[in-house]
From Swiss-Prot:
This is 3-isopropylmalate dehydratase small subunit. Catalyzes the isomerization between 2-isopropylmalate and 3-isopropylmalate, via the formation of 2-isopropylmaleate. InterPro entries: 3-IsopropMal_deHydase_ssu (IPR004431), Aconitase/3IPM_dehydase_swvl (IPR015928), AconitaseA/IPMdHydase_ssu_swvl (IPR000573), IPMI_Swivel (IPR033940), LeuD (IPR050075). Belongs to the LeuD family. LeuD type 1 subfamily. The gene is leuD. Pathway: Amino-acid biosynthesis; L-leucine biosynthesis; L-leucine from 3-methyl-2-oxobutanoate: step 2/4. Keywords: Amino-acid biosynthesis, Branched-chain amino acid biosynthesis, Leucine biosynthesis, Lyase.
Amino acid sequence: MEAFTTHTGRAVPLRRSNVDTDQIIPAHWLKKVTRDGFEDGLFEAWRKDENFVLNRPERQGASVLVAGPDFGTGSSREHAVWALQNYGFKAVISSRFADIFRGNSLKNGLLTVVLEQSVVDALWELSEADPTAEVTVDLEARQVRAEGITADFELDENARWRLLNGLDDISLTLQNEADIAAYEAARPAFKPRTIAA
């Protein structure tokens, strides 16, 4: 997982509330378990509308999604996180996320930032008025900054530490690989063992 410290990029204003994971990536995309190749499935139904915000040329290459409240509701699927990342989003800002989606995001390296709805509104207005306006998401300072906007956000210390250090569940476990190997070597032969790949 790539470490996240500070990211600056253009924003996509997604003025929709209650966006569920099936809208983020439809179920027929869930046939594989690799983490890549999902960008075309992101908001697939909505992207059929030529006026959808992601179809606009000025939004190409934007890397911060500013979403409406209750983003990521519905079923738990890491594919929704992977689709957002594959498209190029490094952070998603909303006034409220579904807990399971937020947990999946943080464990996969996608920073989800909770801000007051008034700040989300200000970011929408800024990015709609000027599609080239940049938004900085600073995890070290726990702050979002844009032209005329500075907002602090909270994130639990464990999730913050893992993101700052680029540690997912597997890499966190592998930090103790030598201890695990020593434990396995000392176990009696009649007990189950881990087999090297």
